[in-house]
Amino acid sequence: MEQQEPGATLDDGMDSFLEKFQSQPYRGGFHESQWEEEFEKIPLFMKNSPSEIDPLENPDLACLQSIIFDEERSPEDQARTYKDEGNDYFKEKDYKKAVISYTEGLKKKCADPDLNAVLYTNRAAAQYYLGNFRSSLNDVTAARKLKPCHLKAIIRGASCHLELKNYVEAVNWCDEGLQIDATEKKLLDLRAKADKLKRTEQRDVRKAKLKEKKQQDQNEALLQAIKARNIRLVAEAAGEDEDSASEGLSELVLYGLSSENPCGARLGVDDQGRLSWPVLFLYPEYAQSDLVSAFHEDSRFIDHLMVMFGETPSWDLEQKYCPDNLEVYFEDEDRAELYCVPPSSTLLQVLQHPRYFVKALTPTFLVCVGSSGFCRNYLRGKKVHQVK
């Protein structure tokens, strides 16, 4: 019997297999209508991997994942795999997934300090590009504890301090890095920028302090000018004695002196030491008001009324609000009494009246037409005094 060679037998077997294979329809091919979706399920050709892998839906991908992240591998190998995965995400600018991968690598708690330092530094970079500068700074700080001379961590930390406007710290980190490599361009550029911003910030702080001191001095001078004129502020109407008023009131008044009222007016003093007040005029008949932003203390009421009512206001439909017809009052709220102010009086004369109290550093007066029915009704039942 003639013996057949092994190769001939193999070839004959393969030929018969191929003949049988060709005669049978192929059942594992793509469907024409959805071949792109099926193609995307092949791990090699996936454009984006799913965030959660279902073994039933993607068995091939689940198999690959189990191989890559085999828990039986050493912590160092697993951490290195997560580092590489994070790097791939980082290159794709998918910084959130990169952070997750680096975090998983750190969770392996491998014994390699250099690898852990790289994981911290890389995660810091991803956090930085996400705008999480504080988290990024925490990571590079952890990296430097493991590897003090890690230049990339130092550069990233300096950048974080710069973004957080910690300019002094940014300069310090740059100086520490330049001790390792005095020619590192990134550190040199960062230091120059941080130092410039630090000097600008320090200058602005000095200017702000000088401005605050100047304002405080001006406010103290204004407060002394008010007290020298025996003008009573509203807090003094609460029955406080002079000492408690000067203690408790000063802070309140100084705050008010530094603030503008809603219309932007503020108590001021001229070169001769004379005061100008923001003064509010109320017209209860029509629920209207006027604010004189700078009523000089030596000016008379009639002088302002002549200007304010030189033309008839739009709301004065009866055209009765003429300077000669107007009466000016201030109210003593404690006693529920009114005081009629002579138009020829100066503002200072009225403010020095023993029953006048200035509220919110803005003197307020009521104005109405003396001969009108509204004025008679408004004054009915009220005790009215005449200011002399």
Swiss-Prot record:
The modification Phosphoserine is found at residues 51, 244. The record marks 152, 156 as: Essential for interaction with HSPA8. One of its GO terms (biological process) is protein folding. Pfam families: Wheel. SUPFAM superfamilies: TPR-like. It comes from the Eukaryota. The keyword Nucleus applies. Keywords: Acetylation, Antiviral defense, Cytoplasm, Immunity, Innate immunity, Nucleus, Phosphoprotein, Repeat, TPR repeat. Coiled coil: none annotated. May act as a co-chaperone for HSP90AB1. Belongs to the TTC4 family. This is Tetratricopeptide repeat protein 4.
